[in-house]
């Protein structure tokens, strides 16, 4: 079964393999692996299986050329989560919420670069 048109990815994505931290609530922080990034969201792999609609923060260092690594921080909502044996964890699709202009510009620069 396919996702409704409103939930389908509409932005270009680029592979991004790095470590990130997700923040749930005010105090819970977990390390995850990233898969890809777009201006609309990103894919991650985690050991936990969050429900669709779960809100979280995410932060990591984004590699940008030229200039090296830049901090990236965003609020996001879980769009989907499914177990992946090949990734040894849950592949989670995140949709960004109210991405700051700085974060949006950095994501666009990364995807375009």
Residue positions per predicted region:
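N-terminal helix initiation/capping motif
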Residues: 1-37, 47, 108-113
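C-terminal output/interaction extensions
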Residues: 85-113
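Beta-strand-rich interaction surfaces with strong enrichment in secreted/lumenal proteins
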Residues: 45-48, 63
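Short, Lys/Arg- and Gly-enriched loop/turn segments at beta-strand edges
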Residues: 63-73
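Short, conserved beta-turn/loop elements at beta-strand boundaries and strand-helix junctions
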Residues: 39, 81-87
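Conserved hydrophobic positions within beta-strands
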Residues: 34, 76-78
């Amino acid at each position: 079964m396919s996702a409704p048109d409103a939930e389908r990815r509409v932005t270009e994505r680029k592979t991004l393999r790095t470590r990130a931290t997700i923040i749930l609530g005010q105090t819970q922080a977990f390390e995850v692996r990233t898969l890809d990034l777009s201006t609309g969201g990103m894919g991650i792999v985690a050991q936990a299986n969050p429900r669709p609609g779960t809100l979280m923060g995410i932060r990591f260092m984004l590699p940008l050329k030229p200039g090296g690594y830049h901090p990236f921080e965003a609020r996001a909502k879980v769009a989907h989560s499914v177990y992946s044996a090949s990734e040894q964890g849950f592949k989670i699709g995140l949709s960004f919420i109210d991405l700051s202009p700085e974060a949006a510009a950095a994501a666009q620069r990364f995807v375009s670069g």
